[in-house]
Amino acid sequence: MSDNDTIVAQATPPGRGGVGILRISGLKAREVAETVLGKLPKPRYADYLPFKDADGSVLDQGIALWFPGPNSFTGEDVLELQGHGGPVILDLLLKRILTIPGLRIARPGEFSERAFLNDKLDLAQAEAIADLIDASSEQAARSALNSLQGAFSARVNHLVEALTHLRIYVEAAIDFPDEEIDFLSDGKIEAQLNDVIADLDAVRAEARQGSLLREGMKVVIAGRPNAGKSSLLNALAGREAAIVTDIAGTTRDVLREHIHIDGMPLHIIDTAGLREASDEVERIGIERAWQEIEQADRVLFMVDGTTTDAVDPAEIWSEFIARLPAKLPITVVRNKADITGETLGMSEVNGHALIRLSARTGEGVDVLRNHLKQSMGFDTNMEGGFLARRRHLQALEQAAEHLQQGKAQLLGAWAGELLAEELRLAQQNLSEITGEFTSDDLLGRIFSSFCIGK
């Protein structure tokens, strides 16, 4: 398998459809056109032609589009064949194309990978293609499109350029120490560094919003049996996703629902009631509940308000709180306010949010929705944002750490060499986002998650 091979793949989803598209990219795309179509179509014009088998019989007829490189998505010669979307027809056409020597099925994401390697896209834009396809809300789709059009890359490139200028200034001060002006202590470098740090902080804030849009928040509902966990899942989901009865232990396994709160994806997980298991099935369900809790972004500690007046989670169930992972945020949800007569709403107890509601009637559930959105710092008024992945957040975080360390070196010891090194490392972290500085292993992991035809 070589990167110089000509590749082919179906660009439309598998299964029956009105239209099915095969995409070919590489040096032999021209030969495919001449062999299957009998001619080379006019560049960038839709040509309605028969698609022929090796014996000259017609396999299908449809639209052929020819994009000679480098003016194509991949930067190579690209041919698209748009025929009928029946799986048998597409399979016959694909087999016909693969009889031509030098062609092979594309790896997942290989078309986008070639576009990146041929400088048609940077890495953040290439990732945005997959994010646009996988977008689960209108806001996520718009943000992914902004990233694809270069909004995120432009912000990162601006930071890289600012760091380049700052490095030049710092290294000039190091190389010419005998100048009358002490460049390191005259305040200009500190001012420029502060500007870069402020710009980076703004990008990090937007990236966190973009990450929430892409990945969402994982919330686990946990508590004793019959506390109303499944009723809360149904209230948040807006449908009967879980079976609700008065019988303790009705929920035996993990139930998952995917919803949106003003555009923010929320992964809600209902778990088995936590207690001493009465049988093997319940024991497995409780083990799975704890596994989900350990991976959660937040736990909703569900409490039956008719069984206790306590509001401090440690007082309600100290063993449960002690077993939770350190620093895992907890929201105490006192349920059945319709029975207890408690005042609906949110307050705080020993650093934990406390919400009183009725999962059965839905009263107070909107307060919980707003709390979940605000607890993640999600801004529904964000305009023109971009999507971001975990690796982007990590790169931005590492760059920020290097800039803060560089600032400490500047102000503490006027150590120009150490400042220059921290600036270089920060610049390297930022360049990883757009792919200017990256490893082949990282590229392989990124593009392998794409669709075959992308």
From Swiss-Prot:
Disulfide linkage: none
Binding residues for GTP: 226-231, 245-251, 270-273, 335-338, 358-360
Root EC class: hydrolase
EC number: 3.6.-.-
Domain named TrmE-type G: residues: 216-377
InterPro entries: G_TrmE, GTP-bd, GTP-bd_TrmE_N, GTPase_MnmE, MnmE_dom2, MnmE_helical, P-loop_NTPase, Small_GTP-bd
Keyword Ion transport: no
GO MF entries: GTP binding; GTPase activity; metal ion binding
Localization of this protein: Cytoplasm
Reported cofactor(s): K(+)
Residues annotated for K(+) binding in this entry: 226, 245, 247, 250
Keyword ATP-binding applies: no
Single GO BP term: tRNA methylation
Binding site for Mg(2+): 230, 251
Primary localization: cytoplasm
Record's GO cellular component terms: cytosol
Top-level taxon of origin: Bacteria
Recorded family membership: Belongs to the TRAFAC class TrmE-Era-EngA-EngB-Septin-like GTPase superfamily. TrmE GTPase family.
Function, in words: Exhibits a very high intrinsic GTPase hydrolysis rate. Involved in the addition of a carboxymethylaminomethyl (cmnm) group at the wobble position (U34) of certain tRNAs, forming tRNA-cmnm(5)s(2)U34.
Name of this protein: tRNA modification GTPase MnmE
Gene giving rise to this polypeptide: mnmE
